[in-house]
Regions:
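C-terminal scaffold of the Radical SAM
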Residues: 1, 22-45, 50-324, 376
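Local cysteine-cluster metal-coordination motifs and their immediate loop/turn environment
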Residues: 7-20
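Short amphipathic alpha-helical interaction segments
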Residues: 324-338
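A short, conserved structural fragment
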Residues: 338-348
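Minor-groove-contacting beta-hairpin "wing" of winged helix-turn-helix DNA-binding domains
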Residues: 349-353
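Short, amphipathic alpha-helical interaction segments positioned at domain boundaries
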Residues: 355-377
């Protein structure tokens, strides 16, 4: 099974924390869509005939794209790839874009999962992050989608925001739960260079929360959501049973996927490809770059993706994929983490307990192989 990803990079305004590739020049929407259709045609053989299981529109703000244009991309893809078994089609959306009329056309087009970028139900926090909706609009967007018949809705929340502590976070979690959504992604705020927050931090006007605050807020997220019946299945992701994000799971398990649009990434099982991060250059036909994954790359990605999930590393699978020596080394390197209970080993699987997944990156680094890679081309 394979996945399709469509990158719509446009935004009406830039959020204070965002370091993804985006553009605020909405006049380029039509030329971009034409180029995306051309790319679909040009890469029709990329997935090697594998059935497409998931389709995902990310950004940027895909909900700025007319629903008819979303339908056009899906319909075109269906003529090139085997999409008959597609079971999850997700569109990322800003709350203020989700009008009843928009939702109705989108659903008829085949979108059956919405990812709503709420981030907070606190208006002051939303203003700080330069979001263009308020809490009331967020609530109404989800309710409108539910009235339209959407039964698979995920919302994004951000924690670790300076000046907004446990009480604000708890209210946002409670508000999300009260809406009856099936999935919640809770991301820790990162202050990246080149963002509004990053520039303020460089001037000494904005400071990230400390480690203790991060751990306390993460524990609150974990306890609140698991207490409400959600499965904590990946560092930042929580789902009711049966509603885990299938498209993201494809990335974590090495499934083939084709990315369409500027800055989109693809994987054909052997090589990674990525498009130029420029609307102008993409429309101009700039070729994708490529990297052949070495055995070391595949091992590092395996460790990284598995240890960010509740499933963890299946040591028998690791031995089958990478050999007995590597699997034995993983177990040896894990000893300090196992002794501290930061890693647990049960039934041949080694994982970070979900409540402690915030530290998974530090654990993952233990296992990385760092010899130089010369496979980029």
């Amino acid at each position: 099974m394979a996945g399709l990803y469509f990158h719509i990079p446009f935004c009406k305004r830039v959020c204070a924390y965002c370091d993804f590739y985006k553009s605020v020049d909405l006049r380029r929407m039509d030329p971009l869509l034409e180029s995306m259709h051309r790319e679909l045609d040009a890469r029709r053989e990329y997935l090697g005939g594998e059935p497409v299981r998931t389709r995902y529109f990310g950004g940027g703000t895909p909900s700025l794209c007319a629903p008819e244009a979303i339908a056009g991309l899906l319909d075109h893809a269906a003529t090139l790839f085997d999409c008959a078994a597609a079971e999850e089609t997700t569109l990322e959306a800003n709350p203020d874009d989700l009008t009843p009329a928009y939702l109705a056309v989108l659903r008829r087009a085949g979108v059956n999962r919405l990812s709503v970028g709420i981030q907070s139900f606190d208006d002051a926090c939303l203003k700080l992050m330069n979001r263009r909706h308020n809490a009331a609009q967020a609530v109404e967007a989800v309710r409108s989608a539910q009235r339209e018949g959407y039964e698979n809705i995920t919302v994004d929340l951000i924690f670790g925001v300076p000046g907004f502590g446990n009480d604000t976070l708890r209210r946002s979690l409670d508000s999300a739960l009260a809406l009856g959504v099936q999935h919640i992604s809770a991301y820790h705020l990162t202050v990246e260079p080149g963002t509004a927050f990053g520039r303020r931090a460089a001037r000494g006007q904005f400071a990230p929360v400390d480690e203790a605050t991060s751990e306390t807020e993460y524990a609150l997220v974990h306890e609140t959501l698991t207490g409400a019946g959600f499965e904590h299945y990946e560092v930042s992701n929580f789902a009711l049973p049966g509603f885990r994000a299938r498209h993201n799971a494809a990335y974590w398990h090495g499934v083939k996927y084709l990315g369409i649009g500027p800055a989109a990434h693809s994987f054909d099982g052997r090589e990674r490809h990525w498009n130029v991060a420029s609307v102008t250059e993409y429309i101009g036909g700039a070729p994708a770059e490529a990297e052949t994954l070495t055995d070391r790359d595949r091992f590092n990605e395996y460790v990284m993706t598995r240890l960010r999930t509740a499933e963890g590393i299946d040591l028998r699978e690791a031995e089958r994929l990478f050999g007995k020596e590597r699997a034995a080394r993983v177990l040896r390197d894990a000893e300090p983490w196992l002794k501290s209970r930061t890693l647990v080993l049960a039934a041949g699987r080694m994982a970070v307990p979900p409540a402690r997944m915030l530290v998974s990156d530090a654990v993952i680094e233990t296992f990385f192989e760092t010899e130089p890679d010369t496979a980029t081309k």
